[in-house]
């Protein structure tokens, strides 16, 4: 019997209509639903502890919410090597494969082993101040170095395998995985790449230079981004749009492919280009 962990963004499923539907489908098709304890209140930060609570007692995780909920869940679930499926209760839903009306069919497919797994690369980031490592993290979508709310140009020297590529003046840089190519990197003018590609994207944000363009490199490369010594203000490093750190002149980031991957369950026959067309090119705002 497959044990399926269930994580819900209760802000998007306040009456638990879709959560209850999911649990009923799991039990109907011969599985066992594993749910975290609930104390009557909910904040997005609660998801981290909920994932830890259920991951030791399940074979996979299904989360209900938007892409933000999926990222929040996956950033912990990957530590347990568990595959994940997302049910879209948000607006765009690039990472959440299943729509609300497809829940029962998706569960039936999973419990009858009619699904495939996609291994998506992640990035590790290490932040150095005065030459000392002070923080490290992993990203599924992207790592963003930005000027934040400071109205000053941020000068970022970017290296690949210790070779200087460019000194980017502007609002910052997005370093993205293929999975993250349809997120902030896309909005900043970066290319769209297939999510299972072995690539890393580097996209300047509002660069104050005519020749500056996004670039793509192999995921075997190591990237270093240095803040110019003369920058006296506080800029920001943001990981997957969820974790923030301060960075200032002389600080630098080292970024490379992580040793682990995120395992994403796919139950739909829609290929990436079909999803891309429906989510981006033909999108209708609600």
Swiss-Prot record:
Residues annotated for NAD(+) binding in this entry: 67-68, 72, 141-142, 152, 171, 182-187, 242
**SUPFAM superfamilies, from UniProt?**
NAD kinase/diacylglycerol kinase-like (SSF111331)
Q: What is its main location?
A: cytoplasm
Q: Give EC number(s), comma-separated.
A: 2.7.1.23
An example GO BP is: NADP biosynthetic process
Cellular component terms per the entry's GO annotation: cytoplasm
Record keyword NADP present: yes
InterPro entries, per database record:
ATP-NAD_kinase_N, ATP-NAD_kinase_PpnK-typ_C, NAD/diacylglycerol_kinase_sf, NADK
Organism's domain of life? Bacteria
Keyword Transferase found: yes
- Where, by residue number, is the active site? 67 (proton acceptor)
* Signal peptide coordinates: none
Q: Catalyses which reaction?
A: NAD(+) + ATP = ADP + NADP(+) + H(+)
Q: What Gene3D superfamilies is this protein classified in?
A: Probable inorganic polyphosphate/atp-NAD kinase, domain 1, Probable inorganic polyphosphate/atp-NAD kinase, domain 2
Keyword annotations from UniProtKB, A to Z: ATP-binding, Cytoplasm, Kinase, NAD, NADP, Nucleotide-binding, Transferase
Give cofactor(s), names only: a divalent metal cation
For this protein, the record's Pfam families field holds: NAD_kinase, NAD_kinase_C
Q: GO: which molecular function terms?
A: ATP binding; metal ion binding; NAD binding; NAD+ kinase activity
- Give its localization: Cytoplasm
Family under the similarity heading: Belongs to the NAD kinase family.
Function of this protein? Involved in the regulation of the intracellular balance of NAD and NADP, and is a key enzyme in the biosynthesis of NADP. Catalyzes specifically the phosphorylation on 2'-hydroxyl of the adenosine moiety of NAD to yield NADP.
> Which PANTHER family does this entry report, sorted A to Z?
NAD KINASE
Q: By what name is this protein known?
A: NAD kinase
Q: Give the species this sequence originates from.
A: Ruminiclostridium cellulolyticum (strain ATCC 35319 / DSM 5812 / JCM 6584 / H10) (Clostridium cellulolyticum)
